[in-house]
Amino acid sequence: MSTATASEPKVAPTRKRSKVKTILLTLVGLFVAFVGVVLAVASTKPATFRVERSTVVNAPPERITPHLNDLKKWTTWSPWEKLDPDMKREYSGAESGVGAKYAWDGDSNIGAGQIEIEEATNEKVAFSLEFLRPMACKNAADFTMTPEANGTKLTWSMHGENTFMGKVVQVFLDMDDMCGPQFDEGLSNLKNLAKKSN
């Protein structure tokens, strides 16, 4: 006596398509919600930013400014130099001081950009800073030197406008946390160089 085996029920193709569609719509909805949250948070970011660090150097400003005015000397103290020793460097304009220019092109660690000194005194060295990649932007930066009892207070600051994309980036990356430690390292290197030139 033969027994009939019940065949397994087949899922209708339309039901499968319905499940896939539901999953896709859910993922799209989550993505849209995520983007909405990011844009909402980005809109609360300030219109400008400023990163600043200071140290006291046991030396007068006259022994600090030569390391700032001559862009070729930045290789001796800049914290970014060691990140890509093979980066391309190009110097133009004045030999030092106002009008001196320095362009770099490196790997993903430092990107590409250029610097031009716009003010150079024993109290302040200011320069424009243009990044070409990984994200194009223009900022201003300066070193100020203030006499103190124990030497010179050296302050390094960078400031600029927060573009829309800049605000979005700052949802995930804090400018102060990202640049502050490198400013501290650069100031420490300058401090040691000024001591050696004593």
Where on the chain are the PLM-derived regions?
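Beta-strand/loop substructures that line and gate deep hydrophobic ligand-binding cavities in soluble
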Residues: 3-4, 11-22, 48, 118, ...
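Hydrophobic pocket/interface hotspot
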Residues: 63-74, 102, 117, 127, ...
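Short, conserved beta-turn/loop elements at beta-strand boundaries and strand-helix junctions
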Residues: 122-125
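Extracytoplasmic/periplasmic/luminal assembly and interaction segments
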Residues: 69-119, 167-169
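Solvent-exposed, acidic/flexible segments
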Residues: 57, 61, 67, 110, ...
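Well-ordered beta-strand positions in beta-sheet-rich domains
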Residues: 52-54, 112-114, 138-142
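Generic C-terminal helix-cap and adjacent flexible tail
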Residues: 192-198
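Hydrophobic ligand-binding cavity/cleft-lining segments
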Residues: 10-90, 94
